[in-house]
């Protein structure tokens, strides 16, 4: 019998979407990973002088999905962003800067992963895993709290696998006390006006949709394409202390004019 506390979660970067690869990194902050195999069946109802609902059933297609909850770390958050947004080229050194932006004129190049979870002989991988929804959340408290990340992923399918022998990595959790929040006028310079002694917490929700491409001759999808982002699907919620700074922000919102 598997013991979930002995599970580990590993990832490997795929070259071809849906083609399994060996895992190359153990994710260090995972709290839970819930697999969801998607297998569709079709019942065929015919007039046969019977009240039975159907006489034949066939597999009609499949895919895979997963829900992932993790503690945000400076090292592993890159897996999440590149799976959701695109693979970024870092610049600088100590710290590195990685620019992430919503797609505009071209389809993004997102990170496809073989996402593996299990222990002993009970090991399964989501092939072609990408993140479609991600929520980052942190809240100041009496004890400094960590940032949490929740993700919804889709992939080609779940398949049996084996875990590779990978070592733990040293990671650094992202804490609420590490954050700074800036709010600037539209058209101004981002990152200029700091909201000091004001922000108590935040929740940032990002959705980067993906659509399966399906072809004759295969139960499972053969690729992905990425439609435009929905305006209402990407949100930032702030918990703010009502002080003079916030008062002016509220006044500008309720006093808006065409």
Model-assigned labels for residue ranges:
Residues 1-258:
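Signature of extracytoplasmic/envelope-associated structural regions
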């Amino acid at each position: 019998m598997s013991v979930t506390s002995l599970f580990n979660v590993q990832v490997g970067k795929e070259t071809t979407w849906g083609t399994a690869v060996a895992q190359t990194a153990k994710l260090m902050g995972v709290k839970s990973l819930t697999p969801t195999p998607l297998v569709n069946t079709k019942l065929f109802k015919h007039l046969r002088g019977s009240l039975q609902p159907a006489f034949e059933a066939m597999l009609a297609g499949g895919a895979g999905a997963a829900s992932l909850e993790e503690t945000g770390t400076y090292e592993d958050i890159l897996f999440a962003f590149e799976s959701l947004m695109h693979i970024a080229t870092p610049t600088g050194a100590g710290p590195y800067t990685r620019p992430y932006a919503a797609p505009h004129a071209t389809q993004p190049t997102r990170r496809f992963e073989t996402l593996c979870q299990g222990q002993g002989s009970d090991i399964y991988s989501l092939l072609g895993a990408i993140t479609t929804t991600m929520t980052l959340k942190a809240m100041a408290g009496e004890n400094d709290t960590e940032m949490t990340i929740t993700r919804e992923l889709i992939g080609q399918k779940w398949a049996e696998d084996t875990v590779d022998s990978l070592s733990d990595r040293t990671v650094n959790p992202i804490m609420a006390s590490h954050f700074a929040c800036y709010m600037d006028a539209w058209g101004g310079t981002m990152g200029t006006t700091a909201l000091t002694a004001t922000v108590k917490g935040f929740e940032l929700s990002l959705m980067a949709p993906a659509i399966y491409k399906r072809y004759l001759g295969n139960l499972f999808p053969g690729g992905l394409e990425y439609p435009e982002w929905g305006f209402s699907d990407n949100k930032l919620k702030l918990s703010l202390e009502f002080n003079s700074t916030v008062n002016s922000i509220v006044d500008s919102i309720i006093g808006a004019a065409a």
